[in-house]
Swiss-Prot record:
GO terms for cellular component: 6-phosphofructokinase complex. Pathway: Carbohydrate degradation; glycolysis; D-glyceraldehyde 3-phosphate and glycerone phosphate from D-glucose: step 3/4. It comes from Clostridium perfringens (strain 13 / Type A). Its main location: cytoplasm. This is ATP-dependent 6-phosphofructokinase 1. Allosterically activated by ADP and other diphosphonucleosides, and allosterically inhibited by phosphoenolpyruvate. It is found in: Cytoplasm. ADP binds at residues 21-25, 154, 185-187, 213-215. It catalyses: beta-D-fructose 6-phosphate + ATP = beta-D-fructose 1,6-bisphosphate + ADP + H(+). Keywords: Allosteric enzyme, ATP-binding, Cytoplasm, Glycolysis, Kinase, Magnesium, Metal-binding, Nucleotide-binding, Transferase.
């Protein structure tokens, strides 16, 4: 193998640049050429490839976003489009592709590998919704962003003696809400994986007031949604001023944390090692602080689990 390519796909995540840096420099270290693909699969089918060197990834390790830019590409589901992508890679002499993204990006890599392109996927998503790995690149940074927002909302909630609802990203995965709720000391955490009782929530808020609490923080995962409506209902029933804040895309931005940089660097280096071993259709993950590779098929088939014991602990200590 003489030449590889790398792209970022789907929603951006802090740490993607650190992963790009690791992939590029590890490949160059082993004498491989590296091509960067701009705008994910959409850029690939448009032939947006350029040669990368050490300077291309200089001083990006702590930058948020992705220097390659990213995009969603629904047409990549079409076989003729994927065949075009494979032909473009072949025309550039690219023998393997490293894909940094989420489950949709991995599916694209899996289908591309069936056309003879060696592929390896790195989990880059703030949602932490890939069950085969303990953590995804970007999750820790997003978590810290959310906790910072919760702490600031707590300041103003305390001043106004109100209830603050914070809606966070995560799609149908409640990990970001759960971890942020624990770290932010939220009185209630609402996630898609666990049943939610509005009456019990209102009871918790009122009991808090009886016990001397002057404010409450509620963290809601976007997979549940309805924060604005919930705020109106709480205020209507309790008479306590309640405000909802949807954090939105601020959760995807910012410089990656040290943990995300280290994780991205380890995973990026591992991706190149896996390709040099002749493997294909693999994804990189971390379990118990060990970096490993796994078949894409196997990884995508693992049913996502939710840490109910951690959720119960949060309920016990945060009320």
């Amino acid at each position: 193998m003489k030449k590889i390519a790398v792209l970022t796909s789907g929603g951006d995540a802090p740490g993607m640049n650190a992963a790009l840096r690791a992939v590029t420099r590890m490949a160059l270290h082993h004498g491989l050429e590296v091509m960067g693909v701009q705008r994910g699969y959409a850029g690939l089918i448009n032939g947006e490839l350029f040669k990368m060197d050490r300077k291309s990834v200089s001083e990006i390790i702590n930058r948020g976003g992705t220097i390659l830019r990213t995009a969603r590409c629904l047409e990549f589901k079409q076989e003729e489009v994927r065949e075009k992508a494979a032909q473009i890679l072949k025309a550039y002499g690219v023998e393997a592709l490293v894909v940094i993204g989420g489950d949709g990006s991995f599916m694209g890599a899996k289908l591309l590998s069936k056309l003879g392109v060696k592929t390896v996927g790195l989990p880059g998503t703030i949602d932490n919704d890939l069950s085969y790995t303990d953590y995804t690149i970007g999750f820790d940074t997003a978590l810290n962003t959310v906790v910072d927002a919760i702490n600031k909302l707590r300041d103003t909630s305390t001043s106004h003696e109100r209830v603050s609802i914070v809606e966070v990203m995560g799609r149908n995965c409640g990990d970001l809400a759960l971890y942020a709720g624990i770290a932010g000391g939220a009185e209630a955490i609402i996630v898609p994986e666990m049943p939610f009782d509005k009456d019990e929530l209102i009871k918790t808020i009122l009991e808090g007031r009886t016990n001397g609490k002057t404010h409450s923080i509620i963290v809601v995962a976007e997979g549940v949604g309805g924060s604005a409506e919930l705020a109106k209902e709480i205020e209507s029933v309790t008479g306590i001023e309640t405000r909802a804040t949807i954090l939105g895309h601020i959760q995807r931005g910012g410089s990656p944390t040290a943990d995300d940089i280290v994780l991205a660097s380890r995973m990026g280096a591992k991706a190149v090692e896996v390709l040099l071993e002749g493997k294909t259709s693999k994804v990189i993950g971390i379990k118990e602080n060990r970096i490993f590779d796994m078949d894409i098929d196997e990884a995508l088939d693992i049913e996502r689990s939710f840490d109910e014991s951690l959720y119960e602990m949060a309920n016990a200590i945060n009320k």
